[in-house]
Amino acid sequence: FTQAGPGSVPEVSRPEFCNDCGHCLLVCPVGAIRHRNLEGRAITEVEKDLLPSFRQVQEMVRARRSIRNFLDKPVEREMIEKVVDAARFAPSAKNTQSTRFIAVDNGETLRRIASMTAAWLGRSAKKLRNPLVRAVYLMRGLTTKEEYSRWIGQFELTARNMEKGIDTILYRAPALVLFHADRRVRFAEANANLALQNATFAA
């Protein structure tokens, strides 16, 4: 926005740069801005009284853990929807909102996902033992020798565990939310990781 002088009406100077983030609508102190692409769409106002203090945010960040011990009971659909809703408010580069979500709570489907993933890791470990594949990875700087060896060991162990009925993929979680995006979108992976962090804190 630009303003020619005191008392004059501000004007949008470069509309082609607008990415429809809606921030201008939120920061206007008198709600005077109308956006042609956001008419009729919900703009969520921030309830400042509910915002946590820095100390509370700091403690939440410090307390965050990767939990791999799940209760053997279903997760309510409403709870899953709340977690996904929190995820979708994550920022994204150029407001592309590229992240999409797939929620799975069917036990049989979850077991198939874990089993197929473990099988893929087992096949990958065999490929990684090929000296030519190893040379390409190291030559292109995709990993280090130590990490490469660790990959093989971890992949093979995961595959063996699954054959024994030990799930070290999903750890028999009752629900799963997959974050995905079109790989052609710039920063799609970073956008998905930001959404994942939101979901993690919400969960």
Name each model feature, range by range.
Residues F1-A203:
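Acidic, surface-exposed loops and disordered segments
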